[in-house]
């Protein structure tokens, strides 16, 4: 993410009383600023307040900001030691390996609307950037650079059509895991996950 899609108010501005709709805007700011600072991170992940896996606007489950940002309540703030580490973890978070385990451990809200509790996320397997060799890190970061500005279709269409960008991410992650796409049965996994998302959508009606 390069251009911010929204703004957070962190100080007073002229004639701002209607905006706050409160008798003590300064008190709101005093309480809000430490909280915002505590949630700042390079890596932000969907699913804290549910995400629709079948929605046309759902392309990724995590994104990276070049500067730490405090996300809204809809997102998890994933703390990392550096921007590079955030990029490596973003590849994992948007990989099909992670999507599969997320779908197996979701809190289902209805149909394809899913979310994940903090305790659940702490139990899941995660790629450890600190355990990667310099060569594997370099290859993963090259994949990130190659695809970071490329528009991706919806998550469901990525799976249905075996989108090359998803293949590229999964190929790099598979190599970091010491395997390959064929060994891990990734093409078939795409089809299974797409069918499952479509089934969830159709059971509850098209969201």
Language-model segments: which ranges?
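Non-catalytic DNA-recognition/assembly elements of restriction-modification systems
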Residues: 128-207
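Polybasic, glycine- and aromatic-enriched phosphate-binding surface used to engage nucleic acids
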Residues: 1-142, 146
């Amino acid at each position: 993410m390069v251009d911010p899609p929204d703004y957070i108010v962190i100080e007073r501005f002229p004639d701002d009383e209607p905006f706050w709709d409160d008798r003590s805007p300064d008190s709101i700011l005093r309480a809000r600023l430490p909280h915002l600072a505590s949630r700042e991170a390079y890596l932000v992940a969907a699913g804290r307040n549910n995400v629709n896996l079948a929605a046309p606007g759902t392309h990724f489950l995590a994104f990276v900001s070049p500067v730490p940002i405090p996300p809204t309540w809809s997102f998890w703030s994933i703390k990392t030691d550096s921007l590079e580490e955030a990029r490596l973890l973003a590849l994992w978070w948007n990989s099909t390996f992670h999507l599969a385990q997320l779908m197996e451990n979701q809190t289902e809200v209805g149909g394809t609307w899913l979310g994940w509790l903090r305790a659940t996320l702490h139990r899941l397997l995660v790629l450890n950037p600190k355990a990667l060799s310099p060569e594997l890190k370099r290859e993963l970061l090259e994949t990130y650079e190659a695809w970071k500005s490329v528009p991706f279709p919806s998550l469901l269409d990525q799976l249905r059509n075996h989108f090359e960008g998803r293949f590229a991410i999964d190929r790099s992650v598979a190599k970091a895991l010491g395997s390959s796409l064929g060994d891990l049965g990734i093409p078939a996994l795409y089809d299974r996950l797409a069918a499952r998302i479509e089934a969830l959508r159709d059971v509850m009606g098209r969201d």
